[in-house]
A protein has these predicted regions:
Chain A
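A short structural micro-motif
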Residues: 140, 201-202, 259-260, 273-274, ...
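Short, amphipathic C-terminal "tail helix"
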Residues: 287, 293, 300-319
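Non-transmembrane, amphipathic alpha-helical segments
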Residues: 2-6, 39, 158, 162-165, ...
Length: 319, 319
């Protein structure tokens, strides 16, 4: 297949995805409809559906790839709705967070509605191994998010906890998107494992880059002021290094949740000066390289190249 | 089977249920463990597991009945955790609501954790029709809860909305408990339909009684002051009749959410005086009768008798 044909296939897959999503989340309850509109029109980058498409294309024909993309995206959307309470996010995909418009209650329950629609899709797909895989990803997602809350509340900062959190809250679903395609394709174990590894490592790099930019990015790129994680007491890989290197100064900044004028700027300075920033960029690069390495198990194809390109994009605009 | 043997079977089923529940919800994340303890030790009446047991016993042997009971109870428990945000409940099963101890965030995400464990159970049971049935019940549950919120927010009070709400928030899961057993037993359609009808009607009567007592019950029976629904702007069958009969006076009480001294007492008086209370008791009795009628499709058994007795209990302590 030529790259041009391939790109057209991706476009039509994503168009079909948007159309089906709109139908799947439709409810007779008006308040759910409001959330639904927010979700459907807000769009987002649809990273997970793209992963499902590319993983499927790399394997050849995969039955129910569209339904898998919908199921994964619905778990993701539900987690955004449930996680808005924690994050106290002022913006989410550039729009006012749903819970500010319609209240926490409707947000949480609409998230439950999306999860019920995801279960209906799984029943329709009719693959019990995929049900188990989704259950496992959803378990890691919720555990990762609770752990993040617990670590912030109790100050249990460690690299091990950070790794568990980013795997749970981001990488687990990316892995599901890729591995799920392999399950539906009944792919050989080596291909399934390769895609699972790719999804997990790519997801980790993705979240590490997000966390990096949360501190080091400009507010224009972020669409919100830098340092959001510090204000929520969330330690990321970069601030973990800073806490080790400057326990007193950075510890004090964390205890006051970066509330003093200049706190975030000071963390940025220390990150550059101590080379903590550089180190984290290096760690992301390694994760991207491992992800690409995992793909070597799959036969060369336009889709595999695209997965590689997707992973490499995590290295852009970091340094 | 004698009634004595039968009661022993129920006891051992419930004991096995508690033990498995403890294992199923176990998590390495400490904060989830706190919620879990609350849930496991708090117990509750386990109405849904009882229904699964009785429906299964009425059908003969049902594979995976215990796993079905766990799955249904986990959806119910998750909904309690997610619904605590709405209800602003001061007590839940006589204990401080989980979210007051550990925060809304942990509560919501721990609910998601329970839902993921429920999906894992479904994968283990391995029956795709049951996955579809659970998805449908979970959809109605979330839709019913959002609708309740919407109706309170917009004042869209009607009997039709009330019926949809009680079916969604309570009866759908009761129906799942009974119909799910029939699906696992591969029971004849007539038996499946009979159990589905019984579960739905019993669940409706159950919620109608709950709503009746919320206004008319003593605070000792309720374990909280009467009139909680009024304070949340929730119209139930009884207050719906009062709004029709005394639009100005009762309308004013609802608009101020029963905040004035004597408001709840006045509603109680009007309910007795206008016979609205009596009418609702009558409606509950009809629902119970229909539920028992549905059971007639099943062969007579100790389990069927117990289901009947369970339904009749909804008529106790009302008048």
């Amino acid at each position: 297949m030529s790259v041009k044909d391939f790109t057209q296939d991706l476009e039509s897959f994503l168009a079909a995805f948007e159309e089906r999503l709109r139908k799947v989340v439709k409810s007779e309850v008006e308040f759910i409809g409001l959330i639904e509109e927010d979700l459907v029109t807000a769009g987002g980058k649809r990273v997970r559906p793209r992963l499902v498409f590319l993983a499927s294309a790399a394997l050849g024909e995969v039955p129910h790839a569209l339904e898998l993309a919908l199921a994964v995206e619905l778990i993701h959307s539900a987690s955004l709705l449930h996680d808005d309470l924690i994050d106290d996010a002022e913006t989410r995909r550039g729009r006012e967070a749903a819970f500010r418009k319609y209240g926490n209650a409707v947000s949480v329950l609409s998230g439950d509605y999306l999860l019920s629609r995801q279960m209906a899709l799984l029943a329709q797909i009719g693959n019990l191994e995929l049900v188990a895989l989704c259950a496992e990803a959803a378990r890691m997602l919720s555990e990762g998010e609770v752990l993040q809350f617990q670590v912030a509340a109790l100050g249990e900062y460690s690299l091990a906890n950070y790794e568990r959190i980013i795997h749970g809250k981001t990488a687990a679903l990316m892995q599901l998107a890729c591995e799920g395609a392999a399950v539906l394709a009944e792919a050989p174990l080596a291909h399934r494992e390769a895609l699972a590894r790719f999804g997990a490592l790519y997801g980790q790099a993705f979240q590490m880059r997000d966390d990096y930019l949360d501190l080091m990015g400009s507010s224009e790129v972020l669409g919100k002021p830098a340092g959001g994680d510090v204000r929520e007491g969330k330690v990321t890989r970069i601030t973990l290094r800073l806490l080790e290197a400057y326990p007193e100064e950075v510890g004090a900044i964390f205890r006051r949740r970066g509330r003093e004028e200049g706190d975030v700027r000071r963390l940025q300075e220390l990150a550059q000066q101590s080379k903590a920033a550089e180190e984290v960029i290096q760690a992301i690069a390694e994760r991207v390289e491992q992800a690409i390495g995992a793909l070597r198990e799959l036969p060369r194809s336009a889709a595999r190249d695209q997965l590689e390109a997707l992973a490499k994009r995590e290295l852009v605009r970091l340094s």
